[in-house]
């Protein structure tokens, strides 16, 4: 099992990995900036990966080649791994957990102009 430090797999779901499948992807709820700020736009997050040791080619290969979109490719795309189990409700991914002043600084530095409004980087609003 491989996971980034900010990805926490649901321990209840680890036992759901079917050993007939080579690989598993835990679909995780994503939280951004605060522990209770659910990010519905990037959830579910393709987070933690799991496989048997004999099927592990490399950690990088596991992260970059076992993707949910592979399941949509036709059977003749033998270059795409398709023996993947999707594990729903697979845990939590926490992104950019920062204090209010750091969140404000991050919003001010974003290139995206839609976030360039006082309401988004005002520290008092962030504290709410």
At which residue positions do the language-model features occur?
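Charged phosphate-binding loop/patch that engages nucleotide di/tri-phosphates or the phosphate backbone
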Residues: 121-128
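Conserved catalytic core of nucleotide-sugar-dependent glycosyltransferases
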Residues: 7-121
